[in-house]
Amino acid sequence: MTLNHPIIRLQGSPFERGLIYGSAAAKKVAHSIETYSTLFAGHAGLSWEKAVALARQFEGPIQEYLPSAIEEMKGIAQGAGVTYGDILALNCRSEIMFARPDGCSVMAVLPESSADGHTYLAQTWDWIMPARASTVILDIKQEPLPRLLMVAEAGMVGGKGFNDKGIGVALNALSTGKGKVGVPLHILYRGILNTSLLTDAMDQVTHTKRAGCGSFTIASAEGLAFCMEYTPDNFDALTTHGEPLCHTNHYLSPLFVADDKVKFLLSDTYVRLNRIRRASKPFIGKLNVDTIMKVLGDHANCPDSVCSHEDMHDPVSMRMCSVYAVVMDLNSQCLWVTNGYPCEGPAYPVKFE
């Protein structure tokens, strides 16, 4: 068996990086557009043209926050043979359809809990099965900024991953049912990975005009980790005193619990948080890539489990599953990613070339 997700190495100016990306992933970018065109129409009643028009309102905040992202998106569009508006809409997809969040299970493992004294960051990405065919791995040289290694949806400029300064990020989609014109979460992803210091990474959440809701789990190779829960109007930072820091798709901070909307949609978020915490306990002091993958492959309450499988009783468009799982070792600077369900393995290592 081999890794199914293509590894695309990017370098040069932002536009040049995008051009390489779009050219290498043109078919997958087209698949991303087709997937979200269908999803927007089915769940939000939006045509793709309307989605592109809605995405335009986020262009100004993106330009102000991270202008290189705009240039990179333009390069992706040219390379993939699609419009810039198409790529902008992909990168704003969570804000266009914020009422339908991804479901993910995240854990950060600190040195005192790992087998080798390393810091690990891991998660499942629970979304719709067609997204599996859109997955790419990006190795991005962007001097003078840190070099990045991340897993993303084709056409996106941000995703879960880490940089060569030891900063890593994972994401849980959350919702209070409110959104504003601001910086979309996939752009925040990239802003976080562009930093060299944990506090600077946290500042990307705390100092930025945020468009929506979410929780970025940000960790460093120095053994620090925080869940940065946020809404458009506020944020909170959650941490741990040594045990794995775990998060799913409901707010944990008292600041936001009363306004949480996902709890009405995904009751399994409570089950998954309970299981990922409990399943990791027997491995405290022994947590490494293999044991973390075992935790992510937990099947309690299957199909609505940490390793989530499609529920055939749900309408086809509502069937969520673990598209893949990823484990990042922030010290050895290697990520392991599965082609599909973590229970099926194997996890393939990917490093900077």
Model regions and ranges:
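C-terminus-biased signal that marks the final domain/tail of proteins
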Residues: 1-103, 193-235, 241-353
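Short histidine-centered catalytic/ligand-binding loop motif
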Residues: 186-194
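Basic side chains
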Residues: 123, 160, 190, 272-277
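Internal mixed beta-strand/loop scaffold within catalytic domains of large alpha/beta enzymes
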Residues: 92-187, 203, 323, 335-337
